[in-house]
Regions:
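Short sequence/structural segments immediately N-terminal
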Residues: 1-112
Length: 112
């Protein structure tokens, strides 16, 4: 089923995070038990979607999983982010709005 993610994986391999972060580092919570709950939930949802071939191409991140990824941006970069003036941002709710290509180009990120 992972062949669906080939384009996203290849784009990640070309990006700046490939040497320091895996898929789970960005897309799964770091805390227990959320880590295992989200892993199980995504495993089920991905298996179902891929088996039934019911997913958009290119693959798109859900709003929930986007919130997990943004939380993980702040998990790793929070100290630095607090030093930067994010003009026009009242809350850091979506790092990918301005940094869409940081994880793996713009494939499946920050798009409706």
């Amino acid at each position: 089923n992972c062949h669906v993610m080939n384009d996203v994986h290849d784009a990640w391999a070309r990006g700046p995070h490939h040497a320091v972060a895996t898929c789970n580092d960005c897309h799964i919570p770091h805390e227990f038990p959320a880590k295992y709950i989200v892993k199980a939930m995504n495993g089920w949802n991905h298996s179902l979607a891929f088996t039934l071939e019911n997913y958009p191409e290119p693959i798109q991140i859900t709003q929930f999983n986007k919130s997990v990824a943004v939380a993980n941006c702040l998990y790793c970069h929070g100290d630095f982010v607090s030093l930067v003036n994010h003009e026009g941002q009242t809350e850091l709710e979506d790092c990918t709005r301005c940094h869409a290509s940081i994880g793996h180009d713009e494939i499946g990120v920050g798009k409706p």
